[in-house]
Amino acid sequence: MADIAEHAGIKHQIYNEHYNKVPNAQKVAELLDADPAVTHVAMVHSETTSGILNDIEAVGKVVKERGRVFIVDAMSSFGGVDIPVKDWGIDFIISSANKCIQGVPGFSFIIARRDLLEASAGKARSLSLDLYDQWKTMEVDGKWRFTSPTHVVLAFAQAMKELEDEGGIEARNRRYTENNRLLIEKMGEMGIRPYIDSTHQGPIITTFFYPEECHFTFSQMYEYIKDRGYAIYPGKVTEAETFRIGNIGEIYPEDIEKVCALMKEFLEEYNHEEN
């Protein structure tokens, strides 16, 4: 988001926390109180770098108390985590056709306060990011301003039907949460610890430290698991070596059991070769 603001020539300040800590709402309040020129606050809900789930409810409260606009990046949480948009003071929430929606990537969508959207007319700093113009075109013609991503829209419609058939966001969240719980449990049995503590661990993706005294590379582990039908993510959020495993998509506890079994086989095979 800071890169977007930089390229658009928007004055901004960055409040960072370490990857394993959530932004502090009181600190946000202090920053806003210290600088009345700040008009908008933007933050990520689910941070896929680490798997942490930020407390947007607490931050939204202090932002609204100070009359500022609150923007939430929910690219990797919308559809998989319940987000009471109005109750949490969110003015703009942005997500994507894929991730927890379980469609395919190709377009993003925004839920916005209508009055703020209308007030943004003529203020866009780029053609492609002119949200007001896109909204007005949709209102008049029901289409994109440029080439419509027809296949992605059809996939999105099917994904929304499947979300409803599953039981909605609550049911999908239960599945993701169980995937995450089982993953952490099985990894723990192999001596592999999660990077994020349970208080702030989200259900979307889980980051793990490498096992202690391991001498294998991520590439070796990745290729072993990939050759057997699964893929994991690299991770580098601290000085320590980490890797990530996603819990979302058409993934069920039996898939988690399988990938953990593959991890166990890899560790046993590698340790045997080392010895």
Region spans (language model):
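PLP-dependent enzyme catalytic core of the Aspartate aminotransferase-like
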Residues: 241-275
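PLP-dependent aminotransferase-like
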Residues: 1-37
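Conserved PLP cofactor-binding pocket of PLP-dependent enzymes
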Residues: 228-244
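Active-site C-terminal subdomain of aminotransferase-like
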Residues: 98-185
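Conserved PLP-binding catalytic core of the aspartate aminotransferase-like
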Residues: 193-224
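Active-site phosphate-binding strand-loop segment of PLP-dependent enzymes
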Residues: 22-79
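Conserved active-site segment immediately N-terminal to the catalytic lysine
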Residues: 86-98
